[in-house]
């Protein structure tokens, strides 16, 4: 049953924060301005997070009136080392969001103040185990950018509005609010920015309904997993869905990912913090996954979910080292230079645990194209790694209307069959896009879990059948589309035609008689 109070609270919050965010940008494009709004939200969150943590510790120690926000910086310094070990970062009381905001309107050097505060937050983690999680986190928050204004005074005026606007967002108390307010607000804003940005937005954000489907497919029969990985993690929302589906603490060893775009990489790390993921429970790297993969030495991943970029160019056979790379070598051939899709599949397979599942959104062309891509499909099928192929509806993603597919990979299959599901009609139309409803998702996941066959919806293909079809993995090859044409009863139709002809003859005879009478 849906918690009405929680839903109302969420909708009210969403309306309010989008109004604030939209107002704040002024004449600046929302997509360009997102780093300021989201970065300010993060600054507020970690300020309130560390203050709440310290205050609670003092209350528990019998000091109920203590407020870290009012503490002199010199005294607070004594706790720096311990707090960095426990929280991963440190903020002086004078540099907390609430205190900087209180003086912002009268601070003629607000841009410099914020630049210093952000540098201090990043530097506080240097030399500690959390250094990688904080390094460069505020790089996209350029306080001297012309996007904020042509002069320092104009820029500071915009920064004051930013601080006040984010302060006005009803995000409640870090501990007491009914919903995961900061993380919720952050994801909502990213959804709005992505939908308004079109194609560029779709490159960093996977819609929540698709994220839910991928994660549920990857966790069928599991109550917990060791960790989750996304080789093209974007803003990280798909990674975080594992905890929402399985429950808090069900992802034992955390969240791992790689992202090539530095702005999106920073958004992803911020997203982790805003969802209260501890600094030692996530590891996001900013590198090219295909040519410079991270997490080589990590324990393999029990869950891999991803929506990698469709048919992008990559080094391929131009790089002589890649054909001997242990990720790609088993297939004996590399994905084409102009289409990296199957390179992401092979990479994911290499990183997958023996008891794990990978659910990856794919461009449909990789299911049927020939040459190198056919050879890679042959390798995947012959070695029994492909568990299921799902045809999705068109228009599910921001910035593209193509109908994508999901490929589900497993290393520990109990049969050598491939399940094909035609879910192309499992959606509802919402404004300009299609959306998967909970009912749509349940139907797909239930069919997948039971490996059930249903006419015009799913087919469990034998290995030999896939072989006979030259390793074509298009769902339409295996699941016959429902014939929606009206069935015609020929006997009934002929009788109706005979009646019409007879009636026509009667009318014609009557008309002839009338004409004869008039002429006579």
Regions found by a protein language model. Give the residues of each.
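A conserved structural/catalytic subdomain of Rossmann-like adenosyl-cofactor enzymes
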Residues: 2-4, 8, 298-520
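Conserved S-adenosyl-L-methionine
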Residues: 200-306, 311-313, 317-322, 327-332, ...
């Amino acid at each position: 049953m849906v918690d009405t109070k929680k839903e109302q609270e969420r909708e009210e919050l969403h309306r309010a924060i989008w109004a604030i965010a939209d107002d704040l940008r002024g004449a600046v494009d929302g997509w360009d301005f997102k780093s300021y709004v989201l970065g300010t939200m993060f600054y507020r969150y970690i300020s309130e997070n560390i203050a709440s943590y310290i205050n609670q510790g003092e209350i528990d120690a019998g000091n109920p009136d203590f407020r870290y926000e009012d503490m002199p910086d010199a005294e607070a310094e004594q706790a720096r080392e311990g707090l960095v070990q426990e929280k991963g970062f440190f903020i002086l009381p004078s540099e907390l969001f609430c205190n900087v905001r209180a003086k912002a309107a009268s601070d003629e050097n607000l841009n410099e103040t914020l630049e210093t505060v952000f540098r201090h937050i990043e530097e506080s983690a240097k030399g500690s185990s959390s250094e990688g999680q904080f390094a460069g986190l505020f790089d996209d928050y350029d306080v001297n950018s012309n996007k904020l204004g042509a002069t320092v005074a104009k820029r500071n005026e915009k920064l004051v509005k930013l601080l006040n606007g984010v302060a006005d967002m009803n995000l409640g108390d870090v501990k007491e609010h009914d919903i995961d307010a900061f993380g919720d607000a952050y994801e909502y804003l990213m959804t709005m920015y992505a939908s308004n940005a079109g194609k560029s937005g779709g490159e960093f954000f996977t819609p929540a309904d698709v994220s839910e489907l991928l994660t549920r497919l990857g966790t069928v029969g599991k109550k917990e997993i060791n960790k989750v990985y996304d080789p093209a993690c974007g803003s990280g929302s798909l990674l975080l869905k594992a905890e929402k589906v399985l429950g808090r603490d069900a992802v034992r060893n955390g969240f791992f990912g790689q992202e090539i775009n530095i702005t999106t990489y920073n958004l992803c790390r911020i997203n982790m913090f805003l969802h209260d993921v501890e600094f030692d429970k996530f590891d996001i790297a900013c590198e090219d996954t295909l040519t410079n993969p991270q997490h080589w030495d990590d324990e393999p991943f029990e869950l891999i979910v991803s929506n990698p970029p469709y048919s992008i160019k990559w080094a391929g056979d131009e790089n002589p080292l890649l054909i001997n790379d242990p990720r790609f070598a088993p297939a004996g051939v590399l994905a084409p230079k102009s289409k990296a899709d199957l390179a992401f599949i092979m990479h994911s397979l290499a990183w997958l645990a023996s008891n794990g599942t990978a659910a990856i959104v794919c461009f449909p062309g990789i299911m049927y194209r020939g040459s190198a891509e056919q050879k890679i499909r042959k390798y995947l099928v012959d070695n029994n790694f492909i568990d299921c192929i799902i045809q999705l509806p068109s228009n599910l993603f921001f910035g593209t209307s193509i109908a994508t597919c999901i490929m589900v990979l497993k290393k520990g299959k109990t049969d050598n069959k491939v399940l094909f599901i035609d879910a192309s009609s499992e959606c509802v139309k919402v404004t300009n896009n299609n959306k998967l409803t909970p009912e749509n998702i349940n139907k797909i996941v239930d069919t997948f879990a039971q490996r059930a066959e249903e006419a015009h919806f799913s087919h469990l293909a034998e290995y030999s059948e896939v072989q006979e079809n030259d390793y074509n993995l298009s769902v339409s090859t295996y699941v016959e589309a429902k014939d929606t044409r009206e069935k015609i009863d020929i006997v009934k139709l002929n009788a109706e035609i005979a009646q019409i002809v007879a009636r026509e003859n009667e009318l014609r005879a009557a008309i002839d008689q009338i004409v004869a009478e008039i002429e006579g």
